Each structure stands twice: as C-alpha cells, then as structure tokens.
C-alpha cells in the first residue's frame, strides 16, 4: 500500500478535495512540482495551471487553478484557491 498524506483543496465556501492522497501535482511559480507523503515543510504561491490529485484509492482528479497558495507540514497539505 502506498504511503499517504492528508490533502485539502479549498476555495471560498467550497471544499474541492478533503482526504487521503498519494500525491498532488501543482503549478508553482518556478514550475510544476509534486508533493508526496512526508514531504519537507514549505509554503509557496501557485500559478495558473492544473492540480492533479492521486487519491489513496488510485483514482486521479484534476482541478483548474487560476492562482492560490500551498502549505505542506506534518504530513498534511493544504491548497487554498
């Protein structure tokens, strides 16, 4: 079984994703990056692009992003759009 982390993707008034994920790929200012379980802690702005979530059950979901911010800490990631 793949290692997971808790991921929340939200925008004002709406949770788009809230659950266990294997990976999330996000568009950052310096290029696309992927967060996985036990990733180093950081905060970074996000740019226009697509977020791709690989859920613990193996499904993949995508979300269009105009801009936002991602925070990773203590095996949790929060993406605010």
Go through the PLM ranges and name each one:
Residues 2-81:
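Compact, glycine-rich, soluble single-domain proteins
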